[in-house]
Design a protein with these regions (language model features):
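Conserved catalytic-core motifs of GNAT/GCN5-like acyltransferases
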Residues: 124-126, 138, 143-161
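Conserved GNAT acetyl-CoA-binding A-motif
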Residues: 108, 115-127
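Short glycine/proline-centered loop/turn elements that form peptide/ligand docking sites
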Residues: 104, 108, 130-133, 149-156
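Short amphipathic helical patch at the helix-1/turn junction of helix-turn-helix
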Residues: 94, 127-128
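Glycine-rich phosphate-binding loop
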Residues: 98-101
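Acetyl-CoA-dependent GNAT
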Residues: 3-91, 95-96, 108-110, 114, ...
């Protein structure tokens, strides 16, 4: 992998939001279930990323090749008082042009390292049932809890299930 993985900071948020907009658009155009049915416009995608970065409960990483964003992943800390040890993993995306270069595991590795060093011991996520992402998570040691049928409308208009997964993270 030639991409550098870095955590988004307040100082880099605006430029990163603009850089990640094409990644979100490409991910939706490729049919992935990431909360959008139609691809957002560049402006909508940029504003969506900016709003995510403004949420104090989130930490986001971006993989870059120079100024070009190739992929991303976000950690969302649990808001409940009984969950300071856990977080949700959302929006692992890699642009189609950059897939197969080890970017997704590098992003997940950065997130897991951060989680462990910050006292988080349990990560959870949901992913489209039967997707490539589900098989990657399984390969990376994530455990399947179960599934929910007809959970989300896909970009094609079909209802698709989601699989709930978790991973225990050792404290650093």
């Amino acid at each position: 992998m030639t991409a550098a993985v870095e955590r988004v900071t307040d100082a880099s948020a605006a430029t990163t939001a603009a850089a990640l907009a094409p990644v979100l658009i490409d991910t939706v155009e490729s049919g992935a279930s990431v909360g959008w049915i139609e691809p957002p416009t560049l402006d909508e995608a940029t504003r969506w990323w900016a709003a995510l970065f403004a949420d104090a409960a989130t930490e986001t990483w971006v993989a870059r090749d120079g100024d070009r964003a190739l992929g991303t992943i976000t950690l969302v800390r649990a808001a409940k008082r009984n969950g300071p040890h856990r977080a949700e993993v959302i929006k692992l995306m890699v642009h189609r042009d950059a897939r197969g270069r080890g970017i997704a595991p590098a992003l997940m590795g950065a997130l897991e390292e951060f989680a462990a060093s910050g006292g988080l011991t349990l990560l959870v996520l949901d992913t489209e049932t039967g997707s490539l992402a589900e098989s990657l998570y399984t390969r990376w040691g994530w455990q399947t809890v179960g599934g929910i049928p007809d959970y989300a409308v896909s970009p094609s208009g079909a209802l698709g299930g989601t699989t709930i997964m978790y991973k225990r993270v050792a404290l650093a």
